[in-house]
């Protein structure tokens, strides 16, 4: 990440000085401990000055609406203490002057205010953008007494410069570091002849081109031109912040989804092991049948009885309850059979549901890893039940749509979108694609009365493979079938579907 330096700050300042001086501060907001939004108005134009003093991302800029959404700014219901202090002293005040401290990453905004006796008073808001030492300090310009700081600095953190209310504001110390010894040694022995040799040396030798700015054209190839320094700062740091926010949200959701996946896998293992154990269900029924067929035998109130097993053609010894008659023992075995059969059926049903849940969670994990925007992760967060769903009409998911040779193709990026594709978009003749045996997006090819060529079908298969968890270089099976052969079982998770009459292509 590129950090803000003095030259960039000064360029931003020169670009916006005319708007800043004479403007009025209308509103102050503090989303977190280390970022602030100042709503400033001048000559009928309103802008939001965004200040970020996080050590890894310190910067300031006038923020666009689009980039405000990228930054995922949420204003707390109860403002922090420093925000309330700034509101008390600065809201409604006019910026009378603004300066960038020479060779420092410090912007000072001077506010013209009035005290309780209606006496004019100039307050300075020092915005210090200096890495881990970044801070915002409000102090009296005349007395240099600090009124408040975004975060206080005590003597245990800095012996030179304490920052807290009531103390004098001291500017940051000037760095006394000069050139390193290595650089000094390199420059010390330079003669005029050597300097001329370096100046005349060819450092770039491209092929002949008409563009006289060839060097810069090639260096800037692939970059995006910006209209202003402010736009550059706003767009760059908003994209960085969005990426940081997305990665942080991904980490949280992955931890939750992996935890659920682990629990589900453990449950599947336990039930599978239980079902694989020796099953006595049929044995209980056989014992009941044998005892019923031999009720004439005098074996009441005995510990066991030896009878002929007509299924396996051999004599067997059947354990009995000596407190019961032979008939009562037969009924006891039938009850054991019924209970065992019911338990087995319930276990198999539970195992089936757990396997569906397992497939669903694997799709969730894929969706989290594939997500690149916060709104996509918000869908997953809602899907996992981590946020309250409001009682209002649900908005249609923003499913990605592309075109292949005139055909519309829809791609689901999460289970909510996948479910919408299957439940709402897919018609009987449309063609649905998905990777076999691995998580991935649902891909839907809309037919609209025109049958697609083999080339179009193969392109859709390639898309289904691309948007899946299949990372190995070897070929992967992609299945496709008509919409009329899809079925969503009742009470099944989002995005879960069964299918038939499918075809498979290796991609």
Language model: regions and residue ranges:
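Extended, highly charged segments
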Residues: 1-507
């Amino acid at each position: 990440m590129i950090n803000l330096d003095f030259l960039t700050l000064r360029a931003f300042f020169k670009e916006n000085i005319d708007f800043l001086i004479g403007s009025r501060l209308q509103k102050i907001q503090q989303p977190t401990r280390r970022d602030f939004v100042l709503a400033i108005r001048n000559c009928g134009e309103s802008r939001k000055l965004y200040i970020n003093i996080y050590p890894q991302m310190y910067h300031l800029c006038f923020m666009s609406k689009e980039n405000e959404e990228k930054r995922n700014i949420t204003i707390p219901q109860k403002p922090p203490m420093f925000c309330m202090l700034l509101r008390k002293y600065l809201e409604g005040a006019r910026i009378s002057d603004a300066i960038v401290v020479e060779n420092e990453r410090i912007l000072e905004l001077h506010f013209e205010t009035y005290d309780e006796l209606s006496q004019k008073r100039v307050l300075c808001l020092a915005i210090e953008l200096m890495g881990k030492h970044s801070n915002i300090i409000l102090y009296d310009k005349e007395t240099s007494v600090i009124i408040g700081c975004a975060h206080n600095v005590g003597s245990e953190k800095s012996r030179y410069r304490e920052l807290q209310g009531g103390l004098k504001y001291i500017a940051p110390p000037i760095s006394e570091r000069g050139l390193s010894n290595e650089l000094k040694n390199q420059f010390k022995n330079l003669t005029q002849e050597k300097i001329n040799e370096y100046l005349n040396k060819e450092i770039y030798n491209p092929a002949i081109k008409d563009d006289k700015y060839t060097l810069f054209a090639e260096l800037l190839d692939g970059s995006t031109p910006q209209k202003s320094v402010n736009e550059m700062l706003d767009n760059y740091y908003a994209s960085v912040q969005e990426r940081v926010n997305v990665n942080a949200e991904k980490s949280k959701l992955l931890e939750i989804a992996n935890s659920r996946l682990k629990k589900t896998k453990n449950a599947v293992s336990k039930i599978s092991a239980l079902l694989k154990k020796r099953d006595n269900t049929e044995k209980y029924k056989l014992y009941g049948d044998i005892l019923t067929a031999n009720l004439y035998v005098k074996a009441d109130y005995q510990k066991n009885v030896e009878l002929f097993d007509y299924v396996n053609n051999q004599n067997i010894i059947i354990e009995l309850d000596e407190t019961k008659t032979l008939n009562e023992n037969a009924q006891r075995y039938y009850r054991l059979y019924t209970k065992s059969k019911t338990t087995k059926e319930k276990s198999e049903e539970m195992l089936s549901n757990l396997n569906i849940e397992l497939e669903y969670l694997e799709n969730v994990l894929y969706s989290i890893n594939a997500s690149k925007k916060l709104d996509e992760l918000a869908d997953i967060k809602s899907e996992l039940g981590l946020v309250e769903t409001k009682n209002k009409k649900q908005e249609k998911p923003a499913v990605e749509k592309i075109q292949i040779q005139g055909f519309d193709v829809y791609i689901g990026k999460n289970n909510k979108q996948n479910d919408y594709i299957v439940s709402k978009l897919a018609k009987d003749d449309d063609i649905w694609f998905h990777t076999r045996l691995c998580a991935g997006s649902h891909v839907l090819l809309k037919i609209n009365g025109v049958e697609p060529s083999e080339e179009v079908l193969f392109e859709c298969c390639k898309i289904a493979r691309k948007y899946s968890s299949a990372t190995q270089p070897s070929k992967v099976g992609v299945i496709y079938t008509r919409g009329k052969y899809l079925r969503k079982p009742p009470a099944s998770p989002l995005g879960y579907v069964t299918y038939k009459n499918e075809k498979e292509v290796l991609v």
